[in-house]
């Protein structure tokens, strides 16, 4: 196990020894998730209150309080040392589907889930210089959002890193 926080999703290899992923660093709050009785009797009953306090869900991005409690962010995970470090905390505030550029491992292509206005974004982020190089928006089909029929963008690079593609259900 390279990250025992109880929460890691959407990962991709950056190189032969490093993974990037969305998730939480190991902390006492996240460690509680491993115990089913704590989950059942403490964490799950408190989730509705937690969501009301922060005013959003994980698909809408982290609030400051959410980030402090859960520690959710993009992580660099070194598989040899087990060291986890977060990056882009003030810029990349939402879970996505990261893809590493084959010609430049400092470039991450990722996406967001649709917001309340049915807008989802995909972007290229420079991990070395900590900024978003480019960002595009697409309309999603609102009636499918937050259902099993939704279509996440899942952006991917071409083999040479010259082009990107996204999944979409929009008509243009």
Q: What residue ranges belong to the model's regions?
A:
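Beta-propeller domains
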Residues: 1-38, 59-73
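Multi-bladed beta-propeller domains
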Residues: 1-9, 41-49, 78-95, 126-151
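Conserved beta-propeller blade repeats
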Residues: 4-29, 91-111, 142-163
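Loop/turn-rich, solvent-exposed surfaces of beta-rich toroidal or solenoidal domains
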Residues: 51-75, 83-131
């Amino acid at each position: 196990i390279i990250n025992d926080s109880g929460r890691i999703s959407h990962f991709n290899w950056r190189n032969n020894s490093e993974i990037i992923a969305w998730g939480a660093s190991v902390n006492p709050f996240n460690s509680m998730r491993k115990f089913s009785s704590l989950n059942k009797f403490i964490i799950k009953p408190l989730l509705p209150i937690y969501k009301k306090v922060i005013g959003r869900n994980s698909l809408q991005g982290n609030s400051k309080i959410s980030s402090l409690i859960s520690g959710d962010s993009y992580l660099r995970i070194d598989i040899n040392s087990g060291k986890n470090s977060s990056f882009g905390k003030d810029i990349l505030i939402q879970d996505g589907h990261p893809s590493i550029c084959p010609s430049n491992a400092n470039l991450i292509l990722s996406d967001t889930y649709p917001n309340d206005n049915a807008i989802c974004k995909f972007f290229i982020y420079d991990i070395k210089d900590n900024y978003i190089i480019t960002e595009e928006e697409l309309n999603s089909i609102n009636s499918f959002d937050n259902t099993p029929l939704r279509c996440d963008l899942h952006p991917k690079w071409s083999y040479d890193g010259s082009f990107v593609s996204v999944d979409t259900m929009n008509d243009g």
